[in-house]
Amino acid sequence: MKRLHVKTYSVLMILAALVWTQKLSAQTFEYPIYEDDDVRIEVKNKGARPTIADFATAIFDYSKEMEFFDKVYEDWKRYQQKKPLRHHGNFIVDIKNGFMSYKTPGAEANDTLYQEMCFWNCADAKHKLVACNVRWKMGEEYGWSEYVGCRFYLYDNVKKTMRVILPEDIGTLYDGNGLAAFFLPRKGKNIRVTVSSEGEQWDEVLEWDGYKFSTKQAP
């Protein structure tokens, strides 16, 4: 019986150490604040917590003056009002899994534009990380423009506002430079990335650890 108590005590000590390590990590990790960072995007939500629809509305409102986003902004408003969409687009809004996507034909016959959003709860319990991704499929290849790529926003749970955060500050090496196509997760926590370079193409995975991502080779 004494040996059993010793084993139980050892297990409890290990669990306590793991919890303490996680708490210590949460206390020491801080997201950077930039010197010229004075833009705060207000997120309005009716419930106790914001949903992916609330984040989408905030980002679309913030981006509506950009020519690229005017069509999705108009269709999003019509979708919320349960009206027919005008730009041959299609929305998937998965509130439970915190994911939304908008798919619409591009300018050319084989072009398709995808816009995706999702969010993660950060381990510090103070923030959420929101991703807004644009992917342009040209037949069997991926195209690029100044709008293609994944942009990230850091949401403050108390202030109910979010701000832009640079990809390199959360561990993502690809920031919309046209060499990578992002696929945000509808389920799970990791981002899949298809990278193209010098005629070659391969997949990588951005693994989420509660604060940031790390790049791994896709299985």
Where does each model-flagged region fall?
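Bacterial Sec-dependent N-terminal signal peptides
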Residues: M1-E30
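Terminal domain-start segments
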Residues: Q27-N121
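Surface-exposed loop/turn elements that mediate protein-protein interactions on large endomembrane-trafficking
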Residues: V93, M100-P105, L154-L166, W208-K212
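Short beta-strand segments that buttress and anchor functional surface loops
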Residues: S101-T104, A131-K137, I191-S197
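Short, surface-exposed coil-to-beta transition loops
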Residues: T112-Q115, V130-A131, E140, S145-C150, ...
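Structural signature of eukaryotic scaffold interfaces centered on beta-propeller domains
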Residues: E116-A125, L179-K187
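Mid-length scaffold segments of soluble, non-membrane domains
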Residues: K126-I165
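Short aromatic loop motif centered on NTY/YTY
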Residues: T161-P219
